[in-house]
């Protein structure tokens, strides 16, 4: 009896153990499968997210460009008489262009090119526009600036004036006379070339280095005998005083304008510089095709009659162009002339500071 009972219990125990082992193996396999499936799914999700992020990064490079201008302050120097930058300031062209990138714009007004480039040398502004002579004086003084584009302007847009009743009838008659001119300005070169044409040594005149407002007062008060000046001050003086034009720059000086930038700005923020030039080009194209509108805009800014300003606008040209070998060569000739007559202390190489961007 007992042996049979033990055999029955033994068989029963074996079945229980066998059942447990079978169930344990199934549980173990199922558990492994579950963890494997979860791991595979997590891997796929992570991979998909990584691919999506990489795709977005590649598809939106402008976001990176925007980040490069974030917090940048673009400081513009301008003259009221410099049509394009004055119009851009009034219309907030640059503020609108930089809004999405997070950059901001500030403006500083100057009476002429030389003090503007002095401010650039001092680190107060990043970008500006002048006639052909100021950057030469600035380079000779060690100013780290860069030519970034040029504007054709016009030789008709600058001249040497004499009072309508003056005894001066020719360029040779300027010998010994007192001539008002903004030192280092575009008309400084016109004066040099005009004297050369008239056979007069630069040392044989009495230059009165005056900014346009002071020069106008001196001219009207007969405190100077002649005045080398550019538009629109030229057109305004002709209309108000009946002054005679002794000569304009035709055949004497190209009278180009130059867009200039601080070298540090060019090196650190080339994308911001390109945005500035793009907006300058758009406003320049508008000015070229709308001289009457430009005159109406400038009139209250300058306190000059719109009709007078329209005369000035119609005898000049507009554009924003990269410097060519021809333009660089002409600018070098001006620099060499200034060095020859000791207006600048050392010779300079224009091509060394021309932007290649």
Residue map of PLM features:
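Pocket-lining segment of extracytoplasmic ligand-binding domains
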Residues: 133, 207-298
């Amino acid at each position: 009896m007992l042996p049979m009972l033990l055999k029955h219990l033994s068989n029963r125990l074996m079945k229980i153990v066998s059942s447990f082992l079978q169930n344990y193996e199934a549980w173990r396999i199922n558990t492994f499968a579950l963890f494997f499936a979860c791991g595979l799914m997590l891997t796929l999700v992570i991979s998909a997210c990584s691919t999506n992020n990489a795709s977005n990064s590649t598809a939106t490079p402008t976001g990176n460009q925007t980040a490069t201008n974030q917090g940048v302050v673009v400081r513009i120097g301008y003259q009221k008489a410099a049509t394009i930058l004055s119009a851009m300031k009034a219309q907030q062209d640059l503020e609108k262009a930089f809004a999405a990138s997070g950059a901001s714009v500030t403006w500083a007004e100057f009476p002429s090119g030389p003090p503007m480039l002095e401010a650039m040398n001092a680190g107060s502004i990043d970008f500006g526009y002048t006639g052909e002579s100021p950057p030469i004086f600035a380079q000779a003084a060690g100013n780290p600036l860069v030519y970034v584009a040029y504007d054709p302007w016009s030789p008709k847009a600058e001249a040497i004036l004499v009072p309508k009743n003056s005894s001066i009838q020719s360029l040779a008659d300027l010998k010994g006379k007192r001539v008002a001119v903004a030192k280092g300005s575009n008309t400084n070169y016109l004066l040099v070339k005009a004297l050369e044409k008239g056979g007069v040594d630069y040392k044989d005149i009495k230059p009165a280095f005056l900014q346009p407002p002071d020069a106008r007062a001196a001219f009207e008060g007969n405190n100077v005998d002649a005045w080398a000046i550019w538009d629109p001050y030229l057109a305004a003086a002709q209309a108000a005083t009946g002054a005679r034009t002794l000569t304009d720059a035709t055949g004497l000086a190209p009278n180009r304008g130059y867009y200039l930038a601080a070298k540090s700005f060019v090196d650190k923020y080339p994308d911001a510089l390109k945005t500035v030039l793009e907006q300058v080009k758009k406003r320049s194209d508008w000015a070229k095709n709308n001289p009457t509108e430009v005159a109406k805009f400038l009139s209250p800014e300058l306190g000059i009659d719109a009709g007078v300003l329209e005369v000035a606008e119609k005898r000049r040209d507009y554009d924003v162009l990269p410097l060519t070998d021809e333009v660089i060569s002409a600018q070098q000739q001006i620099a060499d002339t200034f060095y020859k007559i000791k207006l600048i202390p050392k010779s300079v190489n224009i091509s060394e500071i021309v932007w290649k961007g």
